[in-house]
Amino acid sequence: GTAAVQLAKYYGAQIHAVANTKNIELIKSLGAEKVFDYTQEDFTKQNEQYDVILDAVGKSSYFKCKHLLKSGGVYFSTELGYAMQNMWLSLVTVFMNKKTKFPIPTDNQQDILLFKKIIEEGKYRAIIERVYPLHEIIEATKYVETGQKTGNIVIQVNEG
């Protein structure tokens, strides 16, 4: 989520994001023009429409967001969704006006060089919420699974 906001900003997108109360200012500082506080409102109940919706944490669905997509709009999710629906919808919606895409991560050199450039230009900063020593990796995983993390969790492999 925090990386996506910064990358979208780099490309000049107008960004509306969804976060909890404690993260609103952080998300705005990364480039979001408007932030919906999900503890106060359901962003799917508003009337604005978007070219792209990215669900970076798997809290929504194509079906909840479809009416928010403009004609030709695309819903991305980083999660498989209920019964792996996002993977299947990415195939089914190929011929529809509003699509779902399920991104499959790759490690191509072009993407790595782009992130290097953005970092060197000072237009990207890693948001690191917590650092766990390797022997606490189970606790780190449990924390990530709560869905309450902001940014990244780092596992420190070597002490010192």
Task: Put a short name on every predicted segment.
Residues 1-160:
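Terminal helix/beta-alpha structural elements that buttress the NAD(P)+-binding lobe
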